Amino acid sequence: HLLQFGDLIDKIAGRSGFWYYGFYGCYCGLGGRGRPQDATDRCCFVHDCCYGKVTGCDPKKDIYTYSEENGAIVCGGDNPCKKEICECDRDAAICFRDNLDTYDNKYWLFPNKYCKEESEPC
C-alpha cells in the first residue's frame, strides 16, 4: 500500500516518503519513463520494476504486514503476493537510505519533459 511505503521510507531512510520522493526524477512518484537521473531515481525505477513483477494483488492498494526486529523490517503474513509488495517497498526504502548522500534537490519536482528518452528494460 502506498501509505505503508511512505511509512517504511520514514522508518528506514528517516525522511518523509511523499515529500522527498513523491516528485523526484523520472521514476519517483506516479508513472515513470526515460532514463533514471541518479542513484535515488534508480531506486524508484527498480521499485517500479519490482511492482511490475507482482501478480495476484495490487501493490498500490493492498495492505501488507511487517514487523521490526532488531532494527530491521521483516515482511510477513500468509499472503505471498502481499509479502512480495512489502519486500519491494522495504528494498526501495533501503536503497533511498543508502543513497541519501547523493540525493540532489535539482531532481525534486523534476519536469517530465526531461524524461523523454526510451526507458531501459527492467
From Swiss-Prot:
Coarse class of the protein's main subcellular location: secreted
Protein's organism: Lachesis stenophrys (Central American bushmaster)
GO cellular component, one term: extracellular region
Active site: H47, D89
Family to which the UniProt record says this protein belongs: Belongs to the phospholipase A2 family. Group II subfamily. D49 sub-subfamily.
Lineage: Eukaryota, Metazoa, Chordata, Craniata, Vertebrata
Listed name of the protein: Acidic phospholipase A2
Main function: PLA2 catalyzes the calcium-dependent hydrolysis of the 2-acyl groups in 3-sn-phosphoglycerides.
CDD domains reported for this sequence: PLA2c
Binding site for Ca(2+): Y27, G29, G31, D48
GO MF assignments: calcium ion binding; calcium-dependent phospholipase A2 activity; phospholipid binding
Pfam families xref list: Phospholip_A2_1 (PF00068)
Record-annotated disulphide pairs: C26-C115, C28-C44, C43-C95, C49-C122, C50-C88, C57-C81, C75-C86
Domain of life: Eukaryota
Cofactor annotation remark: Binds 1 Ca(2+) ion.
Cofactors, names only: Ca(2+)
Keyword tags: Calcium, Disulfide bond, Hydrolase, Lipid degradation, Lipid metabolism, Metal-binding, Secreted
